[in-house]
């Protein structure tokens, strides 16, 4: 199968090549670019299945799952930026943490609309920040106080209950297939 970062990369490429439309539909072979048709088989429901190998392939359900994740991330970012009167282009840096931040190709995430279009040099991967913080707290008592102070400054926002998030989520479900 495909890992999450591999799925993002593959969908970004297939969007660019015209194998996936704005709605997330994996095109059947007869509608796909001619040079890629040998990788696509019909699924019996009007969609295509893109085969990398006989055992590794991309289905409509895979693309839909990614669209939901993409819409949640992009919608959340939009709401948080809007609440603070910011736009993505004004950010000095964006830090990505955890497995997501460690393995994702930011250019692919921007290509599918999961992350806002910003300069790649402004994106930083921080790795496993939870483990790093727990390790610091276990080793250094002074760090525990520093981390506690940092945690007290954090604000929890339940996005799922916000109308503005629901609207942003819906806006981000589709892929932008317009060329620059």
Q: Where are the regions a protein language model picked out?
A:
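Helical "lid/coupling" subdomains associated with nucleotide-phosphate turnover
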Residues: 1-180
